[in-house]
Amino acid sequence: MPKFAREQAIRTPNSPAMTDPSKSLTWEQVDEIINRAANLILATDLGEKRRIAVFAENSSETALAHLGGLFGGASSVPVNFHLTAEEASYILKDSESYILFVDDKTAERGIQASREAGITSVIGWDCQEYTEVTNWDDWLLTGSPDLCPDEVVPRPNLLYTSGTTGLPKGTELPPTMFAG
């Protein structure tokens, strides 16, 4: 997608690429955000499994955090935004995630879950009142907008079952399921 986003950004830079109830992003903006996020994630030591987790309601930022992870060579772990801090902590520990992305509605639970799981990097949007959370926009500004490398191999995403017969279980899904 970064190549696709870059091509669209060149052809139609000001055309809408992504819209949610609070904003609309152009192809040029999406291209820059994905590349900045991917380059930052690519440069971060995420351990052997290279996992990030996204604990947020549906939004442009939620999708872009997942895409940044995918193109940054990480396995993305969606965490259901309805979960309690304890339930989210279980998934964060079990998945061995290193970065947690949150929004204003999950930040408090995400901070608690990240502490319990040993995650020290929590990045969020609309979370200005939480000093433990790195601001998404500020974080992105520290990353390079250059096209992320093509040779980065996407890793399988890790989705968790509902846990109807016990604790949720992680199931790896191929990255091409979402973008391929």
Q: What do the PLM-derived regions correspond to, one by one?
A:
Residues 83-113:
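Conserved ATP-dependent adenylate/AMP-binding module captured primarily in the ANL superfamily
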Residues 56, 79-80, 120-129:
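Short beta-strand elements of ligand-binding domains
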Residues 14, 143-162, 166-167:
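Conserved pre-ATP/AMP-binding loop-to-beta segment of ANL
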Residues 3-26, 43, 131:
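AMP-dependent adenylate-forming
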Residues 26-28, 156-180:
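Conserved AMP-binding A3 loop
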Residues 23, 38-86:
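Conserved AMP-binding/adenylate-forming
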Residues 74, 117-121:
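A short helix->loop->beta-strand "cap" motif at the edges of active sites that frequently abuts
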